[in-house]
Curated annotation (Swiss-Prot):
Keyword list, A-Z: Glycoprotein, Heme, Iron, Metal-binding, Monooxygenase, Oxidoreductase, Signal
UniProt pathway: Secondary metabolite biosynthesis
Organism: Claviceps purpurea (strain 20.1) (Ergot fungus)
Induction: Expression is positively regulated by the thioclapurine cluster-specific transcription factor tcpZ.
Function of the protein: Cytochrome P450 monooxygenase; part of the gene cluster that mediates the biosynthesis of an unusual class of epipolythiodioxopiperazines (ETPs) lacking the reactive thiol group important for toxicity. Firstly, L-tyrosine is prenylated by tcpD, before undergoing condensation with L-glycine in a reaction catalyzed by the NRPS tcpP leading to the diketopiperazine (DKP) backbone. Afterwards the alpha-carbon of tyrosine is oxidized by the cytochrome P450 tcpC to form a hydroxyl group.
Nucleotide-binding in keyword set: no
Stated name of the protein: Cytochrome P450 monooxygenase tcpC
PROSITE patterns the UniProt entry points to: CYTOCHROME_P450
Taxon lineage: Eukaryota, Fungi, Dikarya, Ascomycota, Pezizomycotina
């Protein structure tokens, strides 16, 4: 019986596709197929509470389940799916994912996080696996330990602290270029204006100094990667290996990108070895040559750090700029704080108890990089809000439900109010704030990301005052306004910059 169930799971996507090809000619036919498949999936993946009540959740959707909804429409779906209760189930293709929304369930799930496994390719299918499936953030067990041990030293708190002067210089140069190329007052699209800073700041940390030609090549590789992610986000048959034969042009683009991306890293490695540099790429690629890391583990992890996190870093930084522009009293207080610490700026940026640090934290709270966390599973059975979830079942955290939880954050949880952190014990944030992940698999780049955000904001405010353009409705400054073309909520707002007659430092 177990063998039959396993076989059914293996062939299920193919059966669904073949049946759908014959029947999917109307909305009624689609509804019938989705309803039947939902019932079958529920039977194959039973989850009940102590009274025998089955877990609820949205109906399976053709081929993709709720995968695209999670990535592209997460904030809206968070609201829509509230009706299913504090714990519910969605589908990634035909793979079940249990969604948890309460801090107590987050704690219950993560208590054994050191034994958790990330879902294969984030349950996103074949094409996603070709791009990122072997990256550090999506592998588990001894492989994860091996890859993380290679990249962790370069992103540890001590290592990042030593890079403070370089990050500050990069931020200053970026802002200076922005200032020189514009008039005394101008308006920019926030995400577009800041995107290249975190990208090239991270690239410099990985590779050391790059020539202008190399920087242009790297940016172009990033754009090609984003194009491939566009195919991932279109879903459908890109979820399955059959896409290799159905979409030859896209697959050729994929193969060309992967070849060029590996070639770029190998060339930079040889160049840096030749001049005696000891940048992270030298150590990482040496492990590839020695056979300690596979080529896929290396280039997928580098893709994760640079390309996948480009949208994440751009989103975080652009929302920080927007919130400062929309909350001018807070901006004024930050400006005063920077002026007071103008003789110890590196020490100031390293602190976690400043208003600037709280602005970064509040931005990450209000705008987590994704509405639903990367799926992971515990080998142990879990009881989540009364439902018994079998071991090795994918679980995701509804990050907005945690970060906007009125029981912890108060009635004005949706308001940008960084001073709220003055009175909150940081230990209390452990299961009440989702920023860079939770448990032992917390994002490796958290220290670097926070440092980039602080230095960029500091240098930007040194040269400019920020405002929401007067023709824009300020009442909409904190409403949903994001791009739908990326897998994280990139801001789609404008900010007005006014040059200061005199800098703060």
């Amino acid at each position: 019986m177990v063998f039959k169930m396993v076989m059914l799971k293996d062939v299920f996507p193919i059966l669904v596709f073949l049946v759908a090809l014959r029947l999917l000619k109307s909305q009624i036919a689609q509804w019938m197929i989705e309803s039947i498949v939902t019932k079958l999936l529920q039977a194959l993946n039973p989850v009940h509470d102590s009274l025998g009540k089955g877990i609820s959740g949205p109906r399976w959707q053709y081929l993709n389940g709720q995968t695209l909804d999670k990535f592209l429409d997460g904030r809206e779906k968070v609201q829509e799916w509230q009706k299913y209760g504090p714990v519910y189930r969605i589908w990634a293709g035909t793979t079940p994912e249990i969604v948890i929304t309460k801090p107590e369930d987050v704690r219950a799930f993560h208590v054994d996080s050191s034994r958790h496994n990330k879902a294969r390719s984030s349950n996103a299918g074949w094409l996603f696996h070709q791009l990122l499936g072997e990256c550090m953030g999506l592998i588990s067990g001894t492989r994860w330990i091996k890859v993380r041990s290679e990249f962790e030293p370069a992103f540890s708190h001590s290592a990042i602290t030593m890079k403070a002067a370089e990050v500050s210089n990069d931020a200053q140069c970026y802002v200076n270029k922005l200032e020189k190329s514009r008039s005394s007052s101008f308006t920019v699209q926030a995400a577009e204006a800041v995107a290249r800073f975190p990208f090239f700041c991270t690239a410099t940390h990985l590779y050391g100094e790059l020539s202008e030609e190399e920087r242009n090549e790297l940016w172009e590789l990033g754009q090609r990667n984003l194009k491939m992610m566009g195919h991932v986000l279109s879903g459908g048959l890109f979820r399955f290996p059959i896409a290799r034969w159905l979409y030859r042009s896209a697959v050729q683009d994929l193969e060309s990108f992967l070849c060029d991306w590996a070639s770029f890293n190998e060339r930079i490695y040889k160049k840096k070895v030749g001049c005696g540099a000891k940048t992270p790429i030298v150590s990482a690629w040496k492990k590839v040559i020695d056979g300690d890391l596979t080529r896929e583990e290396a280039i997928h992890t580098l893709s994760e750090i640079l390309f996948a996190n480009l949208d994440v870093a751009t989103g975080n930084l652009s929302w920080l700029v927007i919130y400062l522009a929309a909350n001018e009293d807070i901006q004024r207080q930050v400006v005063e704080e920077i002026s007071q610490h103008r003789h110890e700026l590196d020490h100031y940026c390293a602190r976690k108890d400043t208003l600037l640090a709280y602005c970064v934290l509040e931005t990450l709270r209000l705008r987590p990089f994704t509405a639903f966390s990367i799926p992971e599973s515990s080998p142990n059975q879990k009881v989540l809000h009364g439902f018994t979830v079998p071991g090795n079942t994918s679980v995701v955290v509804n990050t907005l439900a945690i970060n906007y939880n009125a029981a912890f954050w108060g009635d004005k949880a949706e308001v940008f109010s960084p001073n709220r952190f003055h009175s909150i014990n940081r230990l209390a944030l452990r299961y009440n704030l989702f920023t860079f992940g939770m448990g032992t698999r917390k994002c490796l780049g958290s220290h670097f990301a926070e440092m980039m955000m602080k230095y960029f904001a500091m240098h930007l405010l040194n040269r400019f005052s920020l405002h929401i353009p007067v023709e824009k409705d300020r009442s909409k400054a904190q409403t949903e306004d994001t791009s739908m073309s990326t897998w994280v909520p990139i801001s789609d707002k404008e900010v007005a910059l006014q040059k200061r007659t005199m800098g703060l430092f």
